[in-house]
Amino acid sequence: MAQAVKIRAEREPAMFYRRIEVKLGVTPLRSDRDLARLVDARLPLATVESLSSHGMSDEEIYSFIVPRRTLVHRKSRREALTHDESDRAVRIARITSLAEEVFGDDAKAGRWLRKAKVRFEGRSPLEMLRTETGARLVEEMLLQLDYGFAA
């Protein structure tokens, strides 16, 4: 997945990573290595609030990143997200940022991400982000759209 994002982000890497920074509520990012370091260090719970304030509904967060009950438990103990939860948060931030670049509009990107696609057997691109393999398929479609290869 990193290779495909890298191809697209070569045009404006600073802007691409800035979008991800804002969504995750983290310090400056310059590369995928920085994202890997974030996952390894485990993202703070504030990341969930940041994603929520940037277009993800509570239900999407509970479904795709961390279950509601687990989140409540983590908040009470002031624990960070796990590595897996951090990885899912980064995955969603990367793909939603890429969609915003491709469509040039946050609202259009959000609608596209939530609309079922025949290509994904009736699932939405957002649903596909549950797995790394699904995220690669979504990323591939976004890049094809960006370069005029997909309808």
Positions of predicted regions on the chain:
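Non-transmembrane "mature" sequence context
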Residues: 1-151
